[in-house]
Amino acid sequence: MDSFKTLQEHKETIRLFMEYGVPGEFAEPAAALLDKFEADIIGLNLFHNFYSCLPEGTEDAIEKLLLLARKQGVFLLCASSFSGTNYLYLVNNEGAVLLGTLAEGLPDRKLLDFFGFKDNESFLALGKDLSCIEEYEISPADRSLCPACQAAVGEYHILGCPVEICPWCNGQLTRCNCRFTRLDVENFDRESQIEKLQERLDTEGRLPFAKEHSPGYPSDVLSDEGDETGVRRQESGDRSKKNF
């Protein structure tokens, strides 16, 4: 995903894509939905993926977002379009990935295990009646979620999250020197170093997110990092190297 300096810039880019991809009769409700999530990076990331590369290659618009599952700052969302198709997206603070349609299910075994589904059949059963699935609603001021990586209370942060507390000194993990001294390195410029740091953190005992860790305003943390789009997924090293 492209890097955006502000959420407003992110929104305006999406709006530009919408001008070319949204049918006229759906322009108003589609714009209203975008406005609703203008301060929510998860919603904006999904919109950006959808409108920048329309799934079917034809004009369409998102009518509503449904929350299928959420874990450790990763959201499994259904984007119901005005054309009647329900698209399945994997979303976090860094971006969104189209997985297919809800009718196709979630065939990836790792994703099924991650979100706690027994098999694809059990996942498909979830989508049989969309009226029973709650709409995705989130406030950036929700203190039960990490304002930077969206991990819920009791869950581990995405590695590199600026809110995570260091288990060795109780300082801010991305700012204290423990990550360097524990590995006896001066900087992190290789994937193997990031992986080794995670192993050390797991051994020591990472501190899961707690409400008292949350700053007064999400922008306080995000602005310190200079990027309101959040942190990169753990398996991607570029941003991890930047934060570590």
Q: What annotation goes with each model-predicted range?
A:
Residues 2-132:
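Long, charged N-terminal interaction/targeting segments
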